[in-house]
Swiss-Prot record:
Its EC number is 2.1.1.33. Signal peptide: none annotated. It comes from the Eukaryota. It is found in: Nucleus. Catalyzes the formation of N(7)-methylguanine at position 46 (m7G46) in tRNA. This is tRNA (guanine-N(7)-)-methyltransferase. It catalyses: guanosine(46) in tRNA + S-adenosyl-L-methionine = N(7)-methylguanosine(46) in tRNA + S-adenosyl-L-homocysteine.
Length: 286
């Protein structure tokens, strides 16, 4: 009786078979499992542009090239080309800018839910884990194939990136209207707080990328982390917290609560969800 194949081989065989079969079949999450969090300070051999103008976004949003020509509906996964930098013969720019970013997008539940709600807005998921990024890319590719001819899900994309290090390499000043930070790693130990995705330094980068009037959405099931994020955003001169009435009137809040994988897990476990929204205010005159 032969030995059972190791899980890594099963995952590899599954991904190879996906490239040879119907692209409209949704990927199975069990073949893309990875540890819950990654160390943002490690060298992950990431590929990133020197500046936003060098990024070729047409690989991730093929329906929105500058020239008005629809490119083949394809997403380059990490087994092929993690990221393409524009060369002199191809601008790599889009008809419109990315306006919504989900930092640490996980398995892409929020991206997929937002796509039909804001079909004319480009949204991007940033995820540091390789297998999870590949899953989201495959899921987007399958959803586009299932909805061919409708334009659905053409407005979302996902790349592997370390948001704590390279956010300004991808995004221009005042480019974004929304930033989502959903169920981030709480890093409970005090010596690990420097790895939290919300800090005075990182909030300045969010303020750089977010236009005046833009919103940062935060949600967590860890109350001390919720308090930490609120304190750091309120203390930053570029942000003000929205009132509870404003939060309840924002349709994205309910989506954020119910459509992320972590949000569903908290609901199943009957846990609490702590939400806070922060508005980017105008810079003072210099």
């Amino acid at each position: 009786m032969g030995r059972a194949r190791p899980k890594s081989q099963k995952r590899g065989d599954y991904r190879v078979s996906r490239s040879q079969e119907n692209a409209a079949e949704l990927p199975k999450k069990k073949f893309y499992r990875q540890r819950a969090h990654a160390n943002p300070f490690s060298d992950h051999h990431l590929v990133y542009p020197a500046c936003p103008d060098e990024m070729d976004w047409t690989l991730y949003y093929p329906a929105f090239p500058t020239q008005g020509e629809t490119l083949p509906n394809h997403i380059f996964t990490h087994n092929q080309s993690c990221m393409r930098i524009s060369d002199s013969t191809r601008s790599g720019s889009l008809q419109k800018n990315i306006e919504v970013v989900d930092i640490g997008c996980g398995f892409g539940g929020l991206l997929v839910a937002l796509a039909p709600l804001m079909p004319e807005t480009l949204a991007l998921g940033l995820e540091i884990r390789t297998s999870v990024t590949e899953y989201v890319q495959e899921k987007i590719r399958a959803l586009r194939a299932q909805n061919e001819g409708t334009g659905l899900y053409q407005n979302i994309g996902c790349i592997r990136a370390n948001s704590m290090k390279f956010l300004p390499n991808f995004l221009r000043k005042s480019q974004l209207s929304k930033i989502f930070i959903c169920f981030p790693d709480p890093h409970f130990k005090a010596r690990k707080h420097k790895a939290r995705i919300v800090s005075a330094t990182l909030n300045s980068e969010y303020a750089f990328a977010l236009r005046p009037g833009g919103i940062v959405y935060t949600i967590t099931d860890v109350e001390p982390l919720h308090q930490w994020m609120a304190e750091h955003f309120v203390a930053h001169p570029s942000f003000e917290r929205l009132s509870q009435e404003e939060e309840e009137a924002d349709e994205c809040v309910q989506v954020m609560k119910s459509e992320t994988e972590e949000g569903r897990k908290v609901t199943r476990n009957q846990g609490q969800k702590f939400v806070a929204l922060f508005r980017r205010i105008e810079d003072p005159p210099w």
